[in-house]
Each structure stands twice: as structure tokens, then as C-alpha cells.
Amino acid sequence: MLGVVELLLLGAAWLAGPARGQNETEPIVLEGKCLVVCDSNPTSDPTGTALGISVRSGSAKVAFSAIRSTNHEPSEMSNRTMIIYFDQVLVNIGNNFDSERSTFIAPRKGIYSFNFHVVKVYNRQTIQVSLMLNGWPVISAFAGDQDVTREAASNGVLIQMEKGDRAYLKLERGNLMGGWKYSTFSGFLVFPL
């Protein structure tokens, strides 16, 4: 009869052998929050992936969508800018949208998609809205037709973000219409880097 030490050595030898039922392109799927994928043809990449090991988090789902349900009217229109606050969050998968500051905070380095749709009231004013990344404008949208009742400023973009980067909308000028939830701000992680 085999002793405990012999059984442990036999088990270790079996585990050290090749994975049963797997080919070199098919990853071994593990239960839980982490997946380790080994590449049988690693490169000489100096970034640390030369070993051919990739670790992916199982909680990579990141998405948010927020709406404004009330009008957003600055008290002074001349050269006054402000963050657009969204008072109702519809989706916040990953809890990376700070509803108090209406700011998205990137949980990891990756490519993110953002879009916004902002409606101006009929007041013969132009609105300008910018998507800001860490305080700098990335894209803007304008609505300024003087002869329409309501007009929308919309835009969308893919952005590479680092962990901790912040994205938010800034009203450069004008008034927003939000009484029927017309103004929206949404984003999601396309893929991590």
C-alpha cells in the first residue's frame, strides 16, 4: 500500500504532465474569477508577456448610462462653464460611474466607448457640450439652429484610458432640456489593454 508521501509525489508527477484533452490553442478554463491562458508560442516581448501568460479578470464588465430628468440652467450665460450633472443612473455595471459628481472613473487600462445626447431648449441660444478626459476636452458637439423648437448635440468616441482616468460632460454654453429625459450620457469598456 502506498504511503501519503508516495501518493503526493505520484499526484505531483501527474499534474506536471501535459493537460489532458486540450490542444495548444485551446485555453484551460478554470472556475472562478480568474482565467490564465498560456501561449505555446511566446514572443520576446519585453513587456512581461514573453512568458506567454495572460491573466484576465472575470469581472471585466464595465458599463453605465445616466439621464438628466430636470432642466440644467446656468444662472449666468457669459463665459460660464459647468459639469453636466445626471440625476438618474439607469445602468452602473462595475460601479465606476460616480453619480454625485457625474464622472466615470476608469477601473483599468483599456479602450472605452462614450456617447452623449444633449437637447437644448428653444431659447435661441447655442449649446456646446464637451466630453472631458482628466480636465481636457476630447470631443465636442454643438446645437445652434435658431429656428427649431428643440435641437440635439450628440457625439461618440473611442478613448484609450488608464486606470483612474476621469471622463465627464461639460456644458460650455447654453441651457439643456431634460424634463423628458432627453439628455443622456453612456459609456462602456470595449476591451482591456
Swiss-Prot record:
UniProt keyword list: Cell membrane, Disulfide bond, Glycoprotein, Membrane, Postsynaptic cell membrane, Secreted, Sialic acid, Signal, Synapse
Chief site of localization: secreted
Residues that carry a glycan: N23, N79
Signal peptide extent: 1-21
GO molecular function terms listed in the Swiss-Prot or TrEMBL record: identical protein binding
Region (Essential for interaction with GRID2): 122-147
Region span, Necessary for interaction with CBLN3, and homotrimerization: 62-193
Domain of life assignment: Eukaryota
Subcellular location: Secreted; Postsynaptic cell membrane
GO biological process terms held by the UniProt record: cerebellar granule cell differentiation; establishment of localization in cell; heterophilic cell-cell adhesion via plasma membrane cell adhesion molecules; maintenance of synapse structure; negative regulation of excitatory postsynaptic potential; negative regulation of inhibitory synapse assembly; positive regulation of long-term synaptic depression; positive regulation of synapse assembly
UniProt-annotated stretches for the region Essential for interaction with NRXN1 and linker of two C1q trimers into disulfide-linked hexamers: 34-38
PROSITE patterns in alphabetical order: C1Q
Domain C1q stretches: 57-193
PTM notes: The proteolytic processing to yield cerebellin seems to occur either prior to the secretion by presynaptic neurons and subsequent oligomerization or in some other location after release of the mature protein. Sialoglycoprotein.
Tissue expression remark: Localized in the Purkinje cells. Cerebellin is expressed in adrenal gland /adrenal cortex (at protein level). In the cerebellum, [des-Ser1]-cerebellin is more abundant than cerebellin. At lower levels also found in heart, kidney stomach and gastrointestinal tract.
Gene3D superfamilies in alphabetical order: 2.60.120.40
Record's GO cellular component terms: extracellular region; glutamatergic synapse; parallel fiber to Purkinje cell synapse; postsynaptic membrane; synapse; synaptic cleft; trans-synaptic protein complex
Subunit structure: Homohexamer; disulfide-linked homotrimers. The trimers are assembled via the globular C1q domains. The trimers associate via N-terminal cysteine residues to form disulfide-linked hexamers. May form oligomers with CBLN2, CBLN3 and CBLN4 prior to secretion. Once secreted, does not interact with other CBLN family members. Interacts with GRID1. Interacts with NRXN1 and NRXN2 long (alpha) and short (beta) isoforms produced by alternative promoter usage. Competes with NLGN1 for NRXN1-binding. Weakly interacts with NRXN3 short isoform and not at all with NRXN3 long isoform.
Name under which the protein is recorded: Cerebellin-1
Species this protein is from: Rattus norvegicus
